[in-house]
C-alpha cells in the first residue's frame, strides 16, 4: 500500500502562512502574545502555538486587555476592533491577509458610494464579520446561493443600488449561481426584464473614477481567492487517483468543509479527521474484493504541512506493508 502525501494543493495558503510566521517571530521576541480568536481554524496548530506562549482570547477577553500585544489573524477585523485597541493601548500586530485587506477596502468604498452590500458567505465567519464592519454592519449576508432561506433577504431593497461580493473562501459556482438568482429575483420584484449585473474592478470604485463615470445600479465583484479555489480541481484529481483519501482539517475550518466535500464527491472513500486518533483501521481494509493499494493524504488551507506529514507517517507505520513508501 502506497501513501501519497499531497504537497501541492494542501497546507497553508499564503495568508495563513504569513500569520503563523509572524506569530512565531513575535513569540520568540516577546515570550507571550495574545491572539484575538483562533489564530487559524485548526486546533492542532493552535495548541502548538499556545505551547510557545500564544494566548487565545474571545470577544470578552479582548475587551479586557490593556497595555499588551495582540495579534490580528489573517481573517481580518472590523473597524470597531481597532477602536477598542486604541482605547486600551494595545499594540496590534496586524496579519490580515492582503487579499482580505483589499476586499475590506472594496466593501468600504462601495458602501461610501451608496451601495447596499450583499456578501456571499457565512454570517458567523470572522472574515465576514470583518467585511460587514466596513459597511456599518448593514450588509445582507447570504449563505444559500439558491435563495432558499427567506430570512437572508430580509431588509433587501431590490430597487436600490446593490453590490454583490463574496467571502474569499466560498465556492465560485455558488457565487455565480447566487448572482443569477439575485438578477431573477430583482426582475421579478421590480416587474422588469432581467438586468445583468455588471462586473467591476477596483479602479471602477475609487472616488476619482466615480466622479467621471456613472456606476451601474447593480454590480458584482468576484472576490473569491483564486489561490484557494485553484485547489479544488487538483484535490478532485488527487482523490480520484487514490483508493482511499484521508482529509485532514480542523472542524471549524470553512475551507476544510468545502475541500472535503470536493474530495468526497470524487472519491466516496474519503474520510475527515482532525488528528490521528480518529483514524479507523477499517478504512484500509479490502473493499469489494479489492485490496487498498494507495492512500492519499491531503488537507485544507488551514492545515499545517507538518501535521499532514505526521498523519502520513502514522498511516505508513501502522497500516502499510514493509514495501510501502511515502510518495511525494
From Swiss-Prot:
Cofactor descriptive note: Binds 1 [4Fe-4S] cluster per subunit.
Highest taxon, organism lineage: Bacteria
Sites where the protein binds (2E)-4-hydroxy-3-methylbut-2-enyl diphosphate: 41, 75, 125, 168, 253-255, 302
Binding site for [4Fe-4S] cluster: 13, 97, 225
Keywords: 4Fe-4S, Iron, Iron-sulfur, Isoprene biosynthesis, Metal-binding, Oxidoreductase
UniProt keyword annotation of Iron-sulfur present: yes
GO BP, sorted A to Z: dimethylallyl diphosphate biosynthetic process; isopentenyl diphosphate biosynthetic process, methylerythritol 4-phosphate pathway; terpenoid biosynthetic process
Pathway: Isoprenoid biosynthesis; dimethylallyl diphosphate biosynthesis; dimethylallyl diphosphate from (2E)-4-hydroxy-3-methylbutenyl diphosphate: step 1/1; Isoprenoid biosynthesis; isopentenyl diphosphate biosynthesis via DXP pathway; isopentenyl diphosphate from 1-deoxy-D-xylulose 5-phosphate: step 6/6
Binding site for dimethylallyl diphosphate: 41, 75, 125, 253-255, 302
Family, per entry: Belongs to the IspH family.
Protein name (database record): 4-hydroxy-3-methylbut-2-enyl diphosphate reductase
Organism: Chlorobium chlorochromatii (strain CaD3)
Gene: ispH
